[in-house]
């Protein structure tokens, strides 16, 4: 078979060029029908009382079939008031816990020991499935806000929690055992066990209520309760702070913001911890990142080669644009390409889809692998992301002075792939002097705004 020439490769190169130049897309979708955006009201309240709440985001694959690869991942949001404690429990799921705001004491129980950690904003730790722990808001004024990525080990997407201490609405895990087993296990009469460890008749009352009634009664459940300052001081005595070392331990928390950012300039900062840099993340194959985009700035268009990134808006507002395929049915795409093969570029371009969304605190975004994305901040924007399939992931930027993959294309290929000449493409790419983050306003618009301001100043100066 004869070797393929550059001219023979023209349709493929054209496709690559169109994928790079996301601005050519002919259609867009707003927040309402955007399969990659979950507004904050998509969180379901599992528990709420005067001391705080626990909320779980709806299943990713229930929101869209495009997210079926995330069926075993859930997002959990926890919030509590000052001087409160989230009582001991264990869950059949691995957790990656990130402190969004506030100060906490996390105690993790081991068979023959316990570890307590003093946590602050940006601190992150993995809690293996089955770990029993309790979380205290040790601050005097600020609410504690925690985000958890949850990976169940029994039923995909269905984490189950078991309380160590019970109440009338949710009994202790111990109450599920028979009297004989409990008496033999503790070598104590059942009445004493019931008095000391179990909620009296809690199991019977619990099963008499339906799910709806239990949710209504959730206001009375003692899952998040008050704790005294003296008790907090006792718990905080031997608490360790997060690791500031370049390499983290297998069990201690690490702070996302204490390391050097991988990208940084006056427009924003991008912090990231990968499995290579942290052993806690290796078996889960997940990276965690923390992004700060300053008001009026832009995280430049880029995509991840392998990772699917789940992003939560912690603070601020902005705009999100994601480029994908208009028709996600690949069989349908092939049929259209066969029918319109001679039209080439024009027919392919119609498949490029722009997904847009306005971002507010609590919103969640999903960025599939290979889908270019850009995020603009209308106010100081803070994002927390979990990257699934982190191993061997590569981030490719499509604009900017550094790490711009388009600039690596050979000049003869640029001549074939883009409407402009190779020189024109290079000149265009060189217009952007920033890397990774940049001013969100185009240069011409910025210049025009400055001219208007100067004109207004000259008019006002005449008075």
UniProtKB/Swiss-Prot annotation:
UniProt-listed CDD domains: cupin_7S_vicilin-like_C, cupin_7S_vicilin-like_N
Ranges annotated as spanning the membrane: none
Coiled-coil spans in chain: none
Keywords: Seed storage protein, Signal, Storage protein, Vacuole
Signal peptide residues on this chain, from the entry's feature table: 1-27
Region annotation (Disordered) ranges: 235-257
GO molecular function: nutrient reservoir activity
GO cellular component annotations of the record: aleurone grain; vacuole
Compartment annotation: Vacuole, Aleurone grain; Vacuole
Disulfide bonds: none
Protein name: Vicilin
